[in-house]
Design a protein with these regions (language model features):
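Conserved thiamine diphosphate
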Residues: 1, 71-73, 98, 100, 106-124, 300-339, ...
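Conformationally flexible catalytic loops at phosphate/diphosphate-handling active centers
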Residues: 1-34, 183
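Glycine-rich ThDP/TPP pyrophosphate-binding loop and its adjacent helix/strand module
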Residues: 20-27, 33-34, 322-361
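Glycine-rich phosphate/diphosphate-binding loops that line cofactor/substrate pockets in enzymes
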Residues: 25-38, 58, 98-100, 194-201, ...
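Glycine-rich, anion-gripping cofactor-binding loops and their flanking helix/strand elements
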Residues: 44-123, 223-253, 268-270, 301, ...
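Short alpha-helices
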Residues: 127-159
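Active-site diphosphate/adenylate-binding microenvironment
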Residues: 171-247, 253
C-alpha cells in the first residue's frame, strides 16, 4: 500500500463529430423549401453544439417559428419574433390551430413527447443516429452535429430560393393566442414571474424537480443560451443545488439561482459546506411543503388519500444553512421578491426557504 509508481496520463481525445451526408442535406433542404408552413423544434443539441446563430439563419430564411424543448430554452431569445417559447403537452395552439404546420425541422431533440404532432413530415437532425425516427415514424433523418448540419442546410436553402417575406405579424398573433390559452396555475405562476423579474437576463436558473421547476419549463422566459439548466429526461431529485454550484464556479460574475423542493434539496443539502468552504455564492430557493409534492398529490387524488412515504419531517432549513455558515432566510411567497433581490446582492451563499402548501398540478 505504500509503494510509489509512475502512471501515464492519457491525453484527452477530441471525439470527431459526425458530418451529415451531402445527399441527405440536399434532400432535407428540398423538403423544407417545399414546406408551406414549416416549424422548427429546437432541443438541447442546439445549446450543446452552440448552434444558435445557424438555427436563426435557417429560421429567418424559411420564416419558420421556433418552439423549444425545456433543454433547448435559450436556443433563441424569447423576445425574437420567431420565438414561440417552450412546447406544452396540452392545450397548445401550435398543435391545434390552422393553418397547421406541415413540416417540422427537429434539431437536437429526441422528440420524446411528439403527442401534438398530427401526421406532419419531420426532418430530424441528431448527433445520435439511434434517435432518428425512434419516436415518430414520418421522419427523414439526418445524422450530424447540429451546428454543422444547420450551416449546410442554410447553404442549400439559399441556393433553392430567396428568403421568404416576414410573417412577424402572423406569429405575434400566434404568440398572443398561446399566452391567452395557457393553463396557468397559482401560486406557481406568480412565483416564476417573481424570480424572472428579479434575476438579470443573463442570470442562470437551475430548474429542479419541484413544482416551480416543472412550471418554469413552459413559463420562465429565457433570453440567452446556457441560462436555463434542467436534469432533462433523467428527472433527478437533488440535481439543482450541486449544478448551481458548478454553474457559479464556471460563471462567477453571473447571478445563479437554483429552485428546489424540500425533498430534493435534502438529497444534497450537505453541499452547503462546499459553498461556504469555497465561497461559491449561489442562491438556492427551497420551496417547503413538507412532502414529496408530486407523489403526495397523486396519492391523495388517485389512491383515495392513502399517503405512504410522501410526507416529510424536515429540519429548520434556515438553521441548517446557518449551521454550515451560509445565510438562511425564510420568506413567504409575497416576500420572495425582496429576499431574492437581497440574496443576489450579498456576497455569500444563501438559502431562501419559502413555506408553501400543496400545489395544483403543473402538467397542463
Amino acid at each position: 500500500m505504500a509503494e510509489v509508481a509512475d502512471v501515464d496520463l492519457r491525453e484527452p481525445e477530441e471525439y470527431p463529430k459526425p458530418v451529415a451526408e451531402t445527399e441527405r442535406i440536399r434532400a432535407g433542404a428540398q423538403m423544407l423549401n417545399e414546406a408551406a408552413n414549416p416549424l422548427i423544434w429546437a432541443g438541447g443539441g442546439i445549446i450543446s453544439s452552440r448552434a444558435q446563430e445557424a438555427l436563426l439563419r435557417v429560421a429567418e430564411h424559411l420564416q419558420a417559428p421556433i418552439i423549444t424543448t425545456p433543454e433547448g430554452k435559450g436556443a433563441i431569445s424569447e423576445r425574437h419574433p420567431l420565438a414561440l417559447g417552450s412546447h406544452r403537452l396540452r392545450n397548445d395552439p401550435v398543435a391545434k390551430e390552422e393553418p397547421h404546420f406541415d413540416t417540422i425541422l427537429a434539431v437536437g431533440t429526441r422528440m420524446a413527447n411528439p403527442v401534438w404532432l398530427g401526421g406532419q413530415r419531420v426532418v430530424q437532425v441528431d448527433i445520435d443516429e439511434a434517435e432518428l425516427g425512434r419516436n415518430y415514424e414520418n421522419t427523414f433523418g439526418i445524422h450530424g452535429d447540429a451546428r454543422q448540419t444547420l450551416e449546410s442546410l442554410y447553404e442549400n436553402l439559399v441556393q433553392l430560393s430567396p428568403a421568404r417575406e416576414s410573417r412577424e405579424e402572423e406569429f405575434n398573433a400566434l404568440r398572443q393566442r398561446r399566452s391567452e390559452t395557457a393553463i396557468r396555475v397559482e401560486p406557481q405562476d406568480s412565483i416564476v414571474a417573481t424570480i424572472r423579474n428579479v434575476m438579470p437576463e443573463d442570470g442562470i436558473l437551475i430548474s429542479g424537480m419541484t413544482q416551480i421547476g416543472y412550471y418554469s419549463r413552459a413559463f420562465f422566459p429565457v433570453y440567452e443560451p446556457r441560462t436555463f439548466l434542467t436534469s432533462s429526461y433523467a428527472g433527478n431529485l437533488g440535481y439543482a443545488y450541486p449544478v448551481a454550484l458548478g454553474a457559479k464556479v464556471a460563471q462567477p460574475d453571473k447571478a445563479v439561482v437554483a429552485v428546489s423542493g424540500d425533498g430534493g434539496f435534502l438529497f444534497n443539502s450537505q453541499e452547503l459546506a462546499t459553498a461556504v468552504q469555497y465561497g461559491i455564492n449561489a442562491v438556492v430557493i427551497v420551496f417547503n411543503d413538507n412532502a414529496y409534492g408530486n407523489v403526495l398529490r397523486d396519492q391523495v387524488n388517485r389512491f383515495e388519500g392513502r399517503v405512504y412515504g410522501a410526507a416529510l419531517h424536515n429540519p429548520d432549513f434556515v438553521k441548517l444553512a446557518e449551521a454550515y455558515g451560509a445565510r438562511g432566510v425564510r420568506a413567504g411567497i409575497d416576500q420572495l421578491e425582496g429576499a431574492l433581490a437581497e440574496a443576489l446582492a450579498v456576497d455569500a451563499p444563501t438559502l431562501i426557504e419559502v413555506p408553501v402548501q400543496a400545489m395544483p398540478t403543473p402538467f397542463e
